[in-house]
Curated annotation (Swiss-Prot):
PANTHER family: UPF0179 PROTEIN MJ1627 (PTHR40699:SF1). Pfam families: UPF0179. It comes from Methanobrevibacter smithii (strain ATCC 35061 / DSM 861 / OCM 144 / PS). InterPro entries: UPF0179 (IPR005369). This is UPF0179 protein Msm_0285. Belongs to the UPF0179 family.
Amino acid sequence: MITLIGKDLAKKGNEFIFYGSVDECENCRFKASCVDSLEKNRKYKIIDVRDNEQKCPVHAENTVIPVEVDRSNITLLSSSKSIFEGSTFSYESADCDEECEYYDYCFPEGLVDGDKCIVLKNHGKHKGECKKGYKLNKLTLGFVI
């Protein structure tokens, strides 16, 4: 999909999380091609940068540029025993309330309950120790859309 992003951020391979639009976007003529194409709280990766700069008062450099984006792969620590490369599943967040050093991997931004995911890579056992005693595997997930 195509969206607009600040010129200084428009680099192939960059990733970002879309947290939603700001008030200034509501009456902008580029709203449909900029923020309306993105889903709030999702992580995206820039796969191509286009030409054709536009003015935008929201970005620091006052310029946006069109980019092609896809949803980013997500790194997840999971205690599931039935996960293998190529398997698909509906994501359900872990039953854990610990705020530990691995929290961002157990509850990664861009992934919400009910997402249909595919395991792209199972990196094996996570070397760190879970405070809840879970045996964790490090996974790279893609999305089934």
